[in-house]
């Protein structure tokens, strides 16, 4: 199955698993593959979200949440004066997919520690998006209000993290 933009999601999962490996050689190869994948945030960020939504391995989901947060956190400009944040290089459509799918991940995630990491990613994404233009994520505030009103204690916690 190919992820958005052409990543083979099974191969991408193997890269994430290799990042978790105790084998230094395997981990170094995975880090290099991830460095190359970062050149294409249009496919990388949706691939993180896809694994967050569909992968059964909690370690993979956890790592994807952390890597996604780091990807949207890297703000600033490169030496060439280009935006260095992966988020800044996404199309409006890809940004929308990432934003809406991340909110869905909060709802569907069953592991508390992973949900917290997803909330951290949403928080960082929110800081970046809302700093640029508050109207760019109109679903965020209604989602948070609904989560606080939910009868689900996990959603209360997620809204307040």
Predicted regions, residues:
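Karyopherin-beta/Importin-beta family HEAT-repeat alpha-solenoid scaffold
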Residues: 1-161
